[in-house]
Amino acid sequence: MNGKLYALSTGPGAPDLITVRAARILGSLDILYAPAGRKGGDSLALSIVRDYLGEQTEVRCCHFPMSADGAEKEAVWNEVAAALTAEVEAGKQVGFITLGDAMLFSTWIFLLQRIGCPEWLEIVPGVTSFAAIAARAKMPLAIERQSLAVISCTAPEAEIAQALQQHDSLVLMKVYGRFARIKALLAQAGLLECALMMSEATLPGEQCWRHLHEVNDDRPLPYFSTILVNKQWEYAE
């Protein structure tokens, strides 16, 4: 059998939100690469997919540093991309799992840049965190002619402020460590009442805040925290 690499999206966190296709592929893999935020640490993505793995699957956890050291991250991306390619060339069925959707703000994208687009690569999409949040909070992402923007809160304040003015509905990702700044921008735009924040959507620790003005600026938030804004939606308590 020819080797193949699958980039498998795990969805937002609940194991039963994995796609049927991803679950089927997970059960057939020879090798699964699972990212971990720190050396020797647990992999959230692996905990999501573990029950779908076949007995034959060898799991390899790989550490992707969260530091600002560009050279360190480049070295890891190069190493993992080379390892994935070598396994495929050896005829293995290989998977790499990533939270949410593989093509949205994911570590996988940096590997894709190095691997390219060979015929032996398949990318399996998944439920995004903000799609899950919208469903859990019963808040539509966009209605009729509304524009929808997905913004990383790592962007400059001026760009975020401009997006808040230009778009009808927004997803503000990577809120962790930046909540006070984002809350202030929402207040300046008069949008606090149009926004909600959810952390760890679909996971056991899920939390939702519908009144952001009541959330202290220095409140500790989980890493997976996202804000949704819809200027034309009123939530019925």
Swiss-Prot record:
EC number: 2.1.1.151
Catalytic reaction annotation: Co-precorrin-2 + S-adenosyl-L-methionine = Co-precorrin-3 + S-adenosyl-L-homocysteine + H(+)
Annotated keywords: Cobalamin biosynthesis, Methyltransferase, S-adenosyl-L-methionine, Transferase
Highest taxon above the source species: Bacteria
Aminoacyl-tRNA synthetase as UniProt keyword: no
GO biological process assignments: cobalamin biosynthetic process; methylation
Pathway per the UniProt entry: Cofactor biosynthesis; adenosylcobalamin biosynthesis; cob(II)yrinate a,c-diamide from sirohydrochlorin (anaerobic route): step 2/10
Entries under InterPro entries matching the protein: 4pyrrol_Mease, 4pyrrol_Methylase_sf, 4pyrrole_Mease_sub1, 4pyrrole_Mease_sub2, CobI/CbiL, CobI/CbiL/CobIJ_dom, Uropor_MeTrfase_CS
One Gene Ontology term of the molecular function aspect: precorrin-2 C20-methyltransferase activity
Protein family membership: Belongs to the precorrin methyltransferase family.
Subunit structure: Homodimer.
Protein name according to UniProt: Cobalt-precorrin-2 C(20)-methyltransferase
Protein species of origin: Salmonella typhimurium (strain LT2 / SGSC1412 / ATCC 700720)
